[in-house]
A protein has these predicted regions:
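Bacterial N-terminal signal peptides
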Residues: 8-16
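Function-determining sites in protein domains
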Residues: 21-176
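Bacterial N-terminal signal peptides that target proteins for export
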Residues: 1-8
Length: 176
């Protein structure tokens, strides 16, 4: 009887979206890497509301068809080839609001300014951030590149360009 009860509880938990279980929202997103001398922090709740870690692929046991972009990925386009090696690459760190601020998910991000294409890499089992990510959510598409969501590209690229301009004027001796 205990075994049946335990299996029922496990089945119920697997069918429940991770976002309902966690009741945690993205508290902060940090963009670092490439030529950024200091990380960019996104803390505006209205902006963060668009980029929830616990949304998209892997957040349901019975995966719905993903017809809309979410998190920072354009899911309907599916996986894509690795972007060109010469593109600037950034680490995007996601912090959740669970009793206290905690880093819970990291992805790689690259953007091709000429084509306007952005790319997101979900670390795979042999990658540095996989264990941390898998502790939060296993999307079952880890280790693959995806096209980034254009809404994410718009926010990220505006912030990156702004920071690069600040760095450029500071490096030339002009205060921003």
């Amino acid at each position: 009887m205990k075994r049946i009860a335990a299996l029922s509880v496990v089945s119920l938990l697997l069918a429940t979206p991770a976002s309902l279980l966690a009741k945690a929202s993205t508290l902060k997103i940090v963009i670092q890497g490439a030529d950024l001398t200091t990380p960019i922090q996104i803390t505006d709740r209205k902006v963060l509301a668009n980029f929830q870690v616990l949304s998209g692929k892997g957040t349901y046991a019975n995966e719905p068809r993903l017809e809309e972009p979410s998190f920072v990925i354009d899911w309907p386009q599916g996986p894509t080839a690795e972007p060109p090696k010469g593109l600037p690459r950034y680490q995007i760190l996601f912090y959740l609001d669970r009793r206290n601020e905690r880093l819970v998910y990291t992805v790689a991000y690259a953007f091709e300014a000429v084509t306007g294409e952005g790319y997101v890499y979900l670390p795979g089992k042999n990658d540095e951030n996989y264990k941390q990510n898998a502790h939060t959510i296993v999307r079952r598409v880890d280790g693959k590149w995806f096209h980034s969501w254009d809404k994410w590209d718009s926010v990220a690229q505006q912030l990156i360009r702004s920071r690069e301009r600040e760095q450029s004027t500071t490096a030339s001796g002009i205060e921003p």
